[in-house]
Amino acid sequence: MAKTIKITQTRSAIGRLPKHKATLLGLGLRRIGHTVEREDTPAVRGMINAVSYMVKVEE
């Protein structure tokens, strides 16, 4: 079984760069407080790094 990580959106996407909004949607995050579980892959880690100021990650 692949390792998963929990990602929670902590800040609003309003007024952010369109690329960052698209990254949040790509992760499956829609609103503040929304939490999703994703596989721990390099692609997902890169997306998290791009929007690290808007999300909280739990291993």
Swiss-Prot record:
A Pfam family recorded for this sequence: Ribosomal_L30
GO molecular function: structural constituent of ribosome
Annotated GO CC locations: cytosolic large ribosomal subunit
Family annotation (InterPro entries): Ribo_uL30_ferredoxin-like_sf, Ribosomal_uL30_bac-type, Ribosomal_uL30_CS, Ribosomal_uL30_ferredoxin-like
GO biological process assignments: translation
SUPFAM superfamilies: Ribosomal protein L30p/L7e (SSF55129)
Cross-referenced Gene3D superfamilies: Ribosomal protein L30, ferredoxin-like fold domain
Endoplasmic reticulum found in the keyword field: no
Keyword Ribosomal protein: yes
Keywords from the named record: Ribonucleoprotein, Ribosomal protein
PANTHER family: LARGE RIBOSOMAL SUBUNIT PROTEIN UL30M, MITOCHONDRIAL RIBOSOMAL PROTEIN L30
Protein family (similarity comment): Belongs to the universal ribosomal protein uL30 family.
Annotated HAMAP family: Ribosomal_uL30_B
Quaternary structure annotation from Swiss-Prot or TrEMBL: Part of the 50S ribosomal subunit.
Protein's name according to its UniProt entry: Large ribosomal subunit protein uL30
Organism listed in the record: Edwardsiella ictaluri (strain 93-146)
Lineage: Bacteria, Pseudomonadati, Pseudomonadota, Gammaproteobacteria, Enterobacterales
